């Protein structure tokens, strides 16, 4: 499960992380600010260190990370129907 939260404390995101961990699912968090609970609860956390409330840079970097991950999957898991 990949979860994204700038504050790292979004209740729905933390609930999803805890649910996934209870089911034995590996979790990856993308957090910003101070990382919040997401940084502590995720199996792997990618933290974008920004000042609290600095959503713009946090969301921009999260978008770049998601784009890179998408490019990786497209390059490594090509489907003949594409």
Task: List PLM regions with ranges.
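Glycine-rich phosphate-binding loops that contact phosphosugars or nucleotide phosphates
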Residues: 1-81
């Amino acid at each position: 499960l990949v979860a994204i939260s700038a504050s790292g404390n979004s209740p729905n995101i933390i609930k999803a992380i805890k649910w996934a961990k209870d089911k034995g699912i590996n979790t990856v968090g993308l957090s910003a600010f101070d990382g919040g609970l997401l940084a502590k609860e995720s199996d792997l956390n990618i933290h974008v260190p920004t000042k609290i409330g600095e959503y713009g840079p946090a969301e921009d970097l999260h978008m770049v990370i998601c784009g890179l991950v998408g490019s990786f999957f497209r390059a490594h898991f090509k489907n003949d129907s594409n």
